[in-house]
Amino acid sequence: MPRAPRTYSKTYSTPKRPYESSRLDAELKLAGEFGLKNKREIYRISFQLSKIRRAARDLLTRDEKDPKRLFEGNALIRRLVRVGVLSEDKKKLDYVLALKVEDFLERRLQTQVYKLGLAKSVHHARVLITQRHIAVGKQIVNIPSFMVRLDSEKHIDFAPTSPFGGARPGRVARRNAARKAEASGEAAEEAEDEE
């Protein structure tokens, strides 16, 4: 049976003015602070944020007792609280408009791994994640931009299959251990020969 073609939608939008120096400096600072690979990661989050803010603005124009505003507004706020972008004491649509890109970047797995002290830097955190050393609960996650929910935050740890999580050491560590054992074995033989 023929399958319908899948339509893809754009996940980011580039800035209208490509060489605005103040924006370029701000993006570079963000990319360095959160260990991002490229500017597209910033554009993707700002695109998501703009869609969320647009929805909040649309709902704020409606009457407070409007069923659509009540239903969709609560759903939007609940989703943002679950991800941890919006705090429990700020459950109003006005606070949704005050959200910044940094609030979303804070919730990335890469940032959370660094904040929990599992990595020496945000860049090291990215390497650990892409090399499948990090698990959220029982699931290995190898996507640095994975959005960590509030209830999943306490389950971030090294994967059970990772050498950092107590599994079999890596290839280089095994080779070094074998060399060390071989060297200590030779030293013991030489000591026996001298006696």
From Swiss-Prot:
GO terms for molecular function: rRNA binding; structural constituent of ribosome. Residues 107-181 form the S4 RNA-binding domain. It holds the Pfam family Ribosomal_S4. CDD domains: S4 (cd00165). The keyword Calcium does not apply. There is a cross-link at K180 (Glycyl lysine isopeptide (Lys-Gly) (interchain with G-Cter in ubiquitin)). SMART domains: Ribosomal_S4, S4. Component of the small ribosomal subunit (SSU). Mature yeast ribosomes consist of a small (40S) and a large (60S) subunit. The 40S small subunit contains 1 molecule of ribosomal RNA (18S rRNA) and 33 different proteins (encoded by 57 genes). The large 60S subunit contains 3 rRNA molecules (25S, 5.8S and 5S rRNA) and 46 different proteins (encoded by 81 genes). Interacts with snoRNA U3. uS11 interacts with MPP10. Component of the ribosomal small subunit (SSU) processome composed of at least 40 protein subunits and snoRNA U3. Belongs to the universal ribosomal protein uS4 family. This is Small ribosomal subunit protein uS4B. It comes from Saccharomyces cerevisiae (strain ATCC 204508 / S288c) (Baker's yeast).
